[in-house]
Curated annotation (Swiss-Prot):
Primary site of residence: membrane
GO terms under cellular component: plasma membrane; respiratory chain complex I
PROSITE patterns found in the cross-reference section: COMPLEX1_20K
Protein name: NADH-quinone oxidoreductase subunit B
Phylogenetic classification of the source organism: Bacteria, Pseudomonadati, Pseudomonadota, Alphaproteobacteria, Hyphomicrobiales
Enzyme class: translocase
Gene Ontology molecular function, alphabetical: 4 iron, 4 sulfur cluster binding; iron ion binding; NADH dehydrogenase (ubiquinone) activity; NADH:ubiquinone reductase (non-electrogenic) activity; quinone binding
Functional summary from the UniProt entry: NDH-1 shuttles electrons from NADH, via FMN and iron-sulfur (Fe-S) centers, to quinones in the respiratory chain. The immediate electron acceptor for the enzyme in this species is believed to be ubiquinone. Couples the redox reaction to proton translocation (for every two electrons transferred, four hydrogen ions are translocated across the cytoplasmic membrane), and thus conserves the redox energy in a proton gradient.
Cofactor(s) needed: [4Fe-4S] cluster
Annotated binding of [4Fe-4S] cluster, by residue: 59-60, 124, 154
Catalyzed reactions per annotation: a quinone + NADH + 5 H(+)(in) = a quinol + NAD(+) + 4 H(+)(out)
Gene: nuoB
Length: 180
């Protein structure tokens, strides 16, 4: 009785991305060079080198930290953390945003270089969450900064945040460099 081993795709790699890289490899093998537009090339490079910074305000920040640990390892998708807003492309707002913290959020967002993206993580960042009716809570960080991706949950899992990162990469690939 023998075992038949079939090759499995790498966990976490979307099949569309595999097909994209396979077509690039085929073109390079056939012709020895690659023909593409500058927009596609810049967007491809941008999706593989997203630098994120945290704006962790509450319990969602724990799941955000878990996403960068070895189990999920967001750096294999080209999503690496940075400590300064001047070195970051993406800001993850995780947790309850209060009225007192809103100007600081806007200041950090303004310090980020263009193009910049925002991921709103969790019910509190998306719409106020459990504290929606409190006098001191902003009912969604999209009232302060433009949000590109919303990740629902209380708190959302690390898988959900990683899926949001992949959606952001797909969005960047679709938009042109000049259009944003």
């Amino acid at each position: 009785m023998g075992l038949i081993a079939t090759p499995q795709p790498v966990v976490g790699t979307p099949p569309a991305q595999d097909n994209y890289f396979l077509s690039i490899n085929d073109q390079l093998a056939d012709k020895g060079f690659l023909v593409t537009s500058t927009d596609e090339l810049i967007n491809w490079a941008r999706t593989g080198s997203l630098m994120w910074m945290t704006f962790g305000l509450a319990c969602c920040a724990v799941e955000m930290m878990q996403m960068s640990m070895p189990r999920y390892d967001c750096e294999r998708f080209g999503f690496a953390p940075r400590g300064s807003p001047r070195q970051s492309d993406v800001m993850i707002v995780a947790g309850t945003l209060t009225n007192k913290m809103a100007p600081a959020l806007r200041k950090v967002y303004d310090q980020m270089p263009e193009p910049r993206y925002v991921i709103s993580m969790g019910s509190c960042a998306n719409g106020g969450g459990y504290y929606h009716y409190s006098y001191s809570v902003v009912r969604g960080c999209d009232r302060i900064v433009p949000v590109d991706i919303y990740v629902p949950g209380c708190p959302p899992s690390a898988e959900a945040l990683l899926y949001g990162v992949l959606l952001l990469q797909k969005k960047i690939r679709r938009t042109g460099t000049i259009e944003r």
